[in-house]
Amino acid sequence: NNKTIPDSMQIIKDYIKENYYEELTLSNISKVVFLSESHISRMFKREFGKSIVAYINEVRLVHAREMLMNSNRSIDEICYAVGYKSRNMFYKYFKAVYGKTPNMYRRSINEKHD
């Protein structure tokens, strides 16, 4: 019995990956697949074991981490470039996932390469 991901859920994942830097809301995501917000929320959580918001944060943080490692952009520039509207939220999520603030993370990378 091969478990397949419903097309609508894969479309949502792809949409988030391609538009992570935009303002993503359940409302605008639900319009992409022509389903209700509550329906896509339930289905996404059932299929992937995480909420749509958690997945958006995951995608954004991966991009932020890459920018911290591979660019000289300021933390604020990176924060807004990956779609966060609030610096505090960016710091909070980043630290929760990587155990360090973005500044500390960048410093630790630079120390490894010195």
Regions found by a protein language model. Give the residues of each.
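Residues within the alpha-helical elements of helix-turn-helix
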Residues: V32, A81-V82, V97
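Short coil turns linking two alpha-helices in DNA-binding domains
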Residues: S36-E37, K85-S86
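…primarily DNA-binding HTH/wHTH and HhH modules…
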Residues: K92-D114
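Hydrophobic, helix-rich cores of sensory/ligand-binding and other regulatory modules
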Residues: N1-N2
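Flexible loop/N-cap segments at domain edges
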Residues: I5-S8
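Short hydrophobic/aromatic patch on the recognition helix
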Residues: H39-I40, F44, M89-F90, F94
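Terminal helix-turn-helix DNA-binding modules in bacterial transcription factors
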Residues: K13-D14, E18, E23, S27, ...
